[in-house]
């Protein structure tokens, strides 16, 4: 039967650290070519897209939780993915981005303090469901419901072709990102303009 367990589990050593340190937001629908590990389908090895992503450093009280929701009545199981972000300091630029984030749906790469990378909202995306703006910054909650827990990313973010623009933290899969008068554009667009 497919529901039967296949492995036991020992108590691990006390060397893990809780919490998350950064997240990467990708607009929903821009991760269509996902390659899974041939042996372990809970691991994603490749993503071959040129979707723009944005990195948020979230050290401190931010968290990523996956709640198992199961019902005996209708024989269903789903995984509620909850990303709670605590963003320090207010700015007019952040206000603008929070408004956009509140209206959108995203795939989110979550990196914890143990350097595990989770791909949250892979099939259905995460959306802002709650939040607060206060004098010290922002608290934002994003939620999504998936058929499986968030997949682990088998490689590093860098191995997927992410190139981080440190000025604006724009990230581009497979294409370099360049800062141009405060707007992020891909090198291919710049080359078309220059040629």
Please report, for each region that a protein language model flagged, where it lies by residue:
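Structured, beta-strand-rich domain cores
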Residues: 62-123
């Amino acid at each position: 039967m497919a529901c039967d367990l296949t492995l036991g589990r020992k108590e691990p050593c006390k060397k893990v650290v809780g919490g998350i340190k950064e997240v990467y937001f990708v607009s929903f629908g821009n991760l269509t070519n996902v390659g899974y590990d041939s042996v372990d389908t809970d691991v994603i090895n490749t993503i071959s897209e040129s979707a723009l992503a944005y990195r948020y450093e979230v050290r401190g009280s931010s968290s990523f939780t996956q709640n198992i929701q199961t019902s005996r009545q209708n024989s269903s199981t789903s995984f509620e993915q909850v990303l709670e972000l605590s963003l320090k300091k207010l700015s007019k630029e952040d206000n603008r981005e929070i408004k956009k984030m509140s209206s959108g749906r995203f795939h989110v790469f979550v990196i914890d303090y143990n350097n595990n990378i989770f791909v949250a909202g892979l099939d259905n995306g995460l959306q802002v469901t709650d939040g607060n703006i206060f004098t010290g910054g922002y608290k934002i909650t994003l939620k999504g419901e998936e058929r499986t827990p968030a997949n682990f990313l088998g490689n590093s973010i860098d191995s997927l072709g992410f190139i981080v623009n440190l000025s604006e933290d724009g990230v581009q899969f497979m294409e370099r990102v360049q800062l141009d008068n405060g707007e992020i554009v891909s090198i291919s667009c710049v080359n078309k303009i220059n040629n």
